[in-house]
Amino acid sequence: CKDHGLTVELSAEDASRTSIDFLKTVYVNAIEHGADRVCLCDTVGILTPESSFEMFKQLKEDIDVPISCHCHNDFGLAVANTFAALKGGASEFHSTINGIGERAGNTSFEECVVGNRY
């Protein structure tokens, strides 16, 4: 991929139920082996804004590449968790149009655009 000018992102599925120390180890290893960015996936939508902020804040202490977040909306908190992740140190996020995604959906792109404006 990198030989063709592409970037590599390691997305850790179900990361929200994984210990932060283990995630740091996995991410640092991936970066040492060429990953340009990493992504914490709240695959089952269990984070709260507080826990989202804290996880990204702790990751940012040891990770020097862009960190993205990927949230699911199982408890209706995907957008709130995304904003909390950005405040905690994420530099980008995954989203879908109208929040359409598996189960209860994902972070809604348009809600993030409007929320960011105000």
Q: At which residue positions do the language-model features occur?
A:
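Alpha/beta enzyme core
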Residues: 1-66, 83-90
